[in-house]
From Swiss-Prot:
This is L-alanine exporter AlaE. Belongs to the AlaE exporter family. Keywords: Amino-acid transport, Cell inner membrane, Cell membrane, Membrane, Plasmid, Transmembrane, Transmembrane helix, Transport. The chain crosses the membrane at residues 25-45, 50-70, 105-125, 129-149. The keyword Transmembrane helix applies. InterPro entries: Ala_export_AlaE. It is a multi-pass membrane protein. Coiled coil: none annotated. It comes from the Bacteria. It comes from Pantoea sp. (strain At-9b).
Length: 167
């Protein structure tokens, strides 16, 4: 059975396409796992202790949060990687850019989640400000955690350029 050049090229092209799709799936899974694990924990602390939400409201917020983290995790990873290109190797620069990425992307989403879950007035303001402060401090730890999870999945840490642009 002889293969034509076109058939061989088509097979190689399909193989490369399948590998890119598999890598994108792995990137999506790694970023989603990292976001859900890290921010479910920190969200509970903020909602209960700072926003003063009831346990029922916290549960509702975490369920909504988990559902929203699935479609948001990979776009956030791409956003973070894009912003981290601006950071230089110094700790201060890494801290600044990781924190800026997290606050600018996640705080508006978080405010909507807790508002929809029942936080109003002062509780909504305190919860949103609390989340913003937490994210300022957690930006770099989350960035390091995200890089660690990506490494566990066999992916590069990101930050040089968005992983989705590697292929």
């Amino acid at each position: 059975m002889a293969l034509s050049w076109q058939s061989l090229i088509d097979r190689i092209t399909n193989l490369a396409k399948n590998q890119r799709q598999k890598k994108r799936g792995t990137e999506f899974l790694a970023d989603t796992v990292a976001l859900i694990l890290f921010f479910t924990t920190t969200g509970i602390i903020n909602e209960r202790m700072i926003a003063g939400m009831s346990w029922d409201q916290v549960l509702h917020a975490r369920l909504i949060g988990a559902a929203l983290m699935i479609p948001v995790a990979r776009p956030y990873g791409i956003w973070r990687d894009w912003l981290m290109q601006r950071a230089n190797p110094s700790r201060g620069s890494q801290l600044l850019w990781d924190s800026m990425a997290l606050v600018s992307f996640q705080v508006p989403i978080y405010a909507a989640i807790i508002a929809f879950s029942g936080a109003t007035g002062g509780g909504l303001v305190r919860g949103t400000l609390g989340a913003a402060l937490m994210m300022l401090f957690l930006g770099r730890p989350y960035g390091a955690f995200l890089n660690w999870v990506r490494k566990l999945f066999g992916l590069p840490p990101g930050g040089d350029k968005p992983m989705s642009l590697d292929s």
